[in-house]
Regions:
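A transmembrane helix-and-boundary motif of multi-pass membrane transporters/channels
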Residues: 2-356, 488-677
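Cytosolic, long alpha-helical scaffolding segments
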Residues: 296-512
Length: 677
């Protein structure tokens, strides 16, 4: 009889084991299927967002490129370059002219253009030529605008605005340095008191300021790139500092000056980048913050519900790994809301109600980070859980109170997250929060009494047998306590906000700029060993490239061409741990960026400049080119570097206007091949 009973018991255990195994396999299969569906849904959303953004940027680049492949647009914006008089090509508008002009020369062969005015009109002069809204010299800088836009644009408005600020500030310092050098040597290298050593020392010092201060990436890139370009022209005795002749209403600023062109083209590129994130569909970080907050609340709800259900189970099963996966996903969502909060400052500048909205969500984010810390304790408890007889006693006593506390806590959390949206806690909302907090306190008391009662049955409150149960109970209670404290602070938000100064250092944009400037140029950091190594590692290649540009002539080298040092300024590694693969990707991006557009343009050149087919083909090529490689930039983390480099360095060839003369076209192609070399 005993043997039969033992056999039956063994069969029951085997059957139970097989049943558990089957159940676990079924749960794993169901979990995998659910995960696959969720993953596909997220991938589909990301694909649509990335594709839409790529198409929008491509559309902006195509519209911006109209003056390049449309002669009418080029004349409207930059004026009439030349005209045919008696089968002879005569130059009309010079590179430094803009606006409507009259010809006070002898005839059409001897053109002398001046600005139109009432006196000339009264004398019988008629408008002769339109020289554009911008001087013709800006036409050569048109690809620079596209390159700036490509290095500036990001997935959201706030991040793009931040990049734009970095770009403009870096370029501004480069322009400021050239004005300083022009003050010392008004004619540049052709000045009587000019000495090359001073110019080299200035260049090295400016590079040191950018690199040793460890400024933001875009600040360093655009600042150093603009510096080497401006300084090369300054040190060229044939050109010197091109201050310009077409004066503006701003003192010391000429519309056709090189410093003005560099500054304005960078600003235009930044404006295009920002506009791409606003129209046709706004991609504001501040609007994502509330969605992220609700997503986090939903994730916390699922995690704590699953944790309590698993805790109240009768045996270990694979559900705990599913819970751990959700915890990891929640951490990613919390990082996202932190990034959106930081970037949203550059959209709102804490003006109006946005200061309060950001303050409320910053407090929410802090509370959620405290919750994230609690999750580590819960994970540890679930891993150690034994499901023995002591555990079953805890489940019977604590299961109900835990679930009730979870429900009340999530109800309070959801209310508070929604109350943050409008940046104001009304008296009615304050009263609701206080009622929710009181309910949480009541449920905490019930749970504490239940735990005290069941733990008292053991000889010790802390023992190996009940340690996981104690830890789990503590974590649930601590989670509720953290959110309770945050909710109480939220209820008193309005009174605290009124006591806060309206223009304190945290919300004043000028104070923030001053603080950043001070931190950048802190001497102890700039002259630290790490900063000096970083400076030498990046400045030496740029200075070597600059020396080649200064002195090398012949073969593939063009003296005083900024291609080599400017490219190095945009490509050097700003991360100390940059890998060989990353540098190889940059090299591939630059190479393909120069060669692929050449192949495209070689086909377009078969059509004459006034051909409608050429107009459509050139515009379509720009659109497809930027749609494809911008999509690579957004969609692929591995190949993003190549995508952005191809887009940024391809503009010089794609945005080349049509040349009716074979000699000019051939010279342009030769120049592009030298750039590749």
């Amino acid at each position: 009889m005993a043997e039969e009973a033992g056999a039956r018991q063994l069969n029951l255990q085997v059957g139970s084991s097989e049943t558990d195994a089957a159940a676990r396999e079924g749960l794993l299969s169901k979990t995998a299927a659910t995960s696959a569906v969720a993953k596909f849904s997220n991938q589909n959303k990301r694909f649509k967002a990335n594709a839409t953004m790529a198409l929008v940027i491509a559309g902006y680049m195509t519209l911006f490129g109209l003056p390049v492949f449309s002669e009418n647009c080029a004349v409207a914006l930059f004026g009439q370059k030349d005209s045919v008089v008696d089968d002879e090509l005569v130059s009309v508008c010079g590179p430094n002219m803009m606006g409507m002009k009259v010809n006070i020369g002898e005839d059409d062969h001897h053109i002398e253009l001046v600005n139109i005015n009432s006196t000339l009109i009264a004398d019988g002069y008629e408008p002769y030529a339109w020289c554009g809204f911008l001087p013709g010299s800006y036409f050569g800088m048109w690809p620079t605008v596209v390159q700036t836009a490509m290095f500036t644009v990001f997935g959201t408005t706030g991040s793009t605005m931040k990049n734009a600020w970095q770009c403009v500030s870096g370029t501004f310092f480069a322009v400021l340095n050239l004005y300083f050098m022009t003050f010392l040597f008004p004619k540049g290298a052709d000045s009587d008191n000019y000495h090359p050593a001073i110019a080299w020392a200035d260049l090295t010092f400016v590079l040191f300021l950018f690199l040793a201060s460890r400024a933001d990436v875009n600040t360093m890139m655009m600042g150093m790139c603009s510096t080497v370009c401006l300084m090369l022209h300054f040190m060229n005795p044939n050109t010197g500092p091109t201050i310009g002749t077409y004066k503006s209403k701003i003192p010391f600023l000429c519309w056709d000056g090189e410093t003005t062109m560099v500054m304005l083209t960078n600003v235009m590129g930044c404006i295009i980048a920002v506009m791409a994130t606003i129209f046709p569909k706004p991609r504001m970080n501040i609007t994502h913050v509330h969605d992220d907050a609700l997503e986090i609340v939903h994730g916390i709800d699922m995690i704590f519900k699953d944790c309590i259900e698993y805790y109240c189970g009768k045996a270990r099963d694979p559900r705990r790994f599913q819970i751990f996966g959700k915890m990891a996903a929640l951490s990613s969502a919390m990082s996202r809301i932190s990034g959106n909060l930081e970037a949203s400052y550059w959209e709102t500048f804490n003006l109006g109600k946005f200061a309060k909205i950001r303050e409320l969500y910053a407090a929410f984010n802090t509370a959620m980070k405290n919750t994230e810390d609690v999750l580590y304790s819960i994970k540890s408890a679930l891993l150690q859980l034994d499901f023995n007889e002591h555990h079953l006693e805890f489940v019977e006593a604590l299961g109900g109170p835990m679930e009730e506390l979870r429900v009340e806590t999530l109800d309070c959390l959801t209310r508070c997250a929604n109350f943050c949206k409008d940046g104001q806690i009304s008296p009615e909302e304050k009263e609701e929060i206080k009622k929710s907090v009181q309910k949480m306190l009541d449920k905490q008391q019930v749970l504490a009494q239940a735990f005290k009662k069941v733990a008292g049955k053991s000889k010790q409150y802390i023992s190996q047998d009940i340690a996981p149960d104690s830890l789990f109970n503590f974590a649930i209670s601590q989670w509720a306590k953290e959110l309770q404290d945050w909710a109480e602070d939220l209820a008193d938000f309005e009174s605290k906000w009124r006591r806060k100064a309206c223009c304190d250092a945290e919300t004043n944009v000028f104070a923030i700029a001053a603080s950043q400037f001070k931190s950048l140029f802190e001497l102890s950091n700039m002259f630290s060993q790490q900063s000096l190594i970083f400076f030498l590692m990046n400045a030496i290649p740029i200075l070597v490239g600059y020396a080649i540009a200064m002195f090398a002539s012949g073969s593939v080298f063009v003296q005083y061409s900024s291609t080599i040092p400017a490219t190095l300024a945009l490509l050097v590694s700003y991360e100390s741990g940059a890998t060989f693969f990353t540098n190889l990707q940059k090299l591939m991006g630059v190479t393909f960026g120069h060669t692929l557009p050449l192949l495209v343009m070689s086909m377009i050149e078969f059509f004459p400049c006034d051909s409608y087919v050429r107009f459509l083909l050139h515009g379509t090529s720009i659109f497809v080119f930027y749609a494809a490689f911008t999509f690579v930039y957004y969609a692929s983390e591995q190949w993003a570097t190549i995508g952005i480099m191809i887009g940024a360095f391809g503009c010089g060839t794609l945005f080349r206007p049509c040349e009716n003369h074979v000699e000019l076209s051939a010279a342009a192609y030769a120049g592009h091949y030298k750039d590749i070399a």
